[in-house]
Amino acid sequence: LGDAERLEVADASVDVVTVAFGVRNFGDLGAGLREIARVLKPGGKVVILEFSTPRNPLFRRVYGLYSHRLLPAIGGMISKDRKAYEYLPASVDEFPAPECFMAMMREAGFKDCRARSQSLGIAQIYTGEK
């Protein structure tokens, strides 16, 4: 385990960085992205899988009811930790929209940034190259 904003890895020493459902938990999203760029070799790739808010208004509403009401209730009953299941949708709501996140990636030093919607928009796969 370590701090994603202070990786114990040499500059330009990594070919690929992958993150699954973690960047929305970075204390400083920009710093975390810059740190990923720092450790990547020139031409290195970053692949990030992260939750997203669906764009379709009807599905967004249905998914919002599920994630904000049903998931915390059921998850809290099973785990006895409702707060963890309330945090999840709140953190997704606060995460930047795909266009904004890709702008942050470019600002951190990535090029050819792309987002591919998954599962009707509840997740995105972001890619970029150093």
Where are these regions (language model features)?
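Alpha-helical transmembrane segments of multi-pass membrane transport proteins
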Residues: 3-5, 29, 48
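A short hydrophobic/small-residue beta-strand
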Residues: 46-47, 112
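A short acidic, Gly/Pro-enriched loop at the edge of an enzyme's catalytic core
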Residues: 1-17
